[in-house]
């Protein structure tokens, strides 16, 4: 049996789904959503699902640990840590947030273009204002230009959605010569080949 320790505050039904992945897994839970790893607490787990850097055990207390999957996308803060320079496999959730964040960005753009905050303002006041045609007349997105600084998984999903509204998309990334996305991307989302944006500039060009 492979021991798996989950330090996220997952509900019982989700923990059951994790356990059901394989009969060879022995899954346990230690909720560290509101605290760091308990001092002196040892574990024999081989796989750890962790909320973040502060939720990790000292390596001398986790002699069997072989793989840590992080709940978050960014783990750069671990670069100077003991575990970063060990043989333990470290993986993150980078890429999974693109559909939700892309949807959120487009929701804000559409709210701005359609004067939604203005609608709500007058609705809450129970007022039908003078000059309302000028106040409520929406802007059309088609033909406008959207700039995206950082063409990672989220930026690429924003680009994909923006093109559906007829926007011209200009993006920037650190290395504009390598336009492909080499990380995980939710199937059907984003721009894995780097062909959706109308133009991709090097990051220095955005300064």
Residue ranges and their predicted role:
Residues 9-12, 31-34, 50-56, 71-75, ...:
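Short beta->alpha connector loops
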Residues 25-34, 47-52, 125-132, 183-184, ...:
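Short gly/ser/thr-rich secondary-structure transition/capping motifs
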């Amino acid at each position: 049996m492979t021991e798996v320790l989950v330090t996220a505050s997952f509900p019982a039904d989700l923990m059951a789904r994790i356990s059901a992945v394989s009969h060879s897994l022995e899954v346990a839970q230690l909720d560290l959503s509101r605290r760091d790893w308990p001092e002196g607490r040892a574990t024999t787990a081989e796989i750890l699902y962790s909320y973040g850097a502060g939720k990790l055990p000292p390596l001398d207390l986790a002699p069997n640990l072989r793989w840590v999957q992080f709940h978050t996308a960014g783990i750069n803060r671990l670069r100077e840590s003991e575990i970063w320079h060990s043989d333990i496999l470290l993986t993150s959730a980078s890429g999974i947030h693109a559909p939700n964040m892309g949807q959120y960005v487009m929701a804000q753009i559409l709210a701005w273009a359609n004067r939604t905050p203005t609608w709500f303002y007058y609705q809450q006041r129970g007022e039908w204002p003078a000059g309302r045609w000028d106040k409520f007349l929406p802007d059309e997105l088609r033909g406008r230009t959207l700039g995206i600084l950082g063409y990672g998984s989220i930026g690429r999903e924003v680009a994909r959605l923006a093109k559906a509204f007829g926007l011209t998309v200009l993006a920037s990334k650190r290395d504009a010569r390598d336009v492909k996305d080499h990380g995980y991307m939710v199937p059907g989302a984003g721009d894995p080949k780097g062909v959706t944006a109308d133009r991709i500039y090097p990051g220095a060009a955005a300064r």
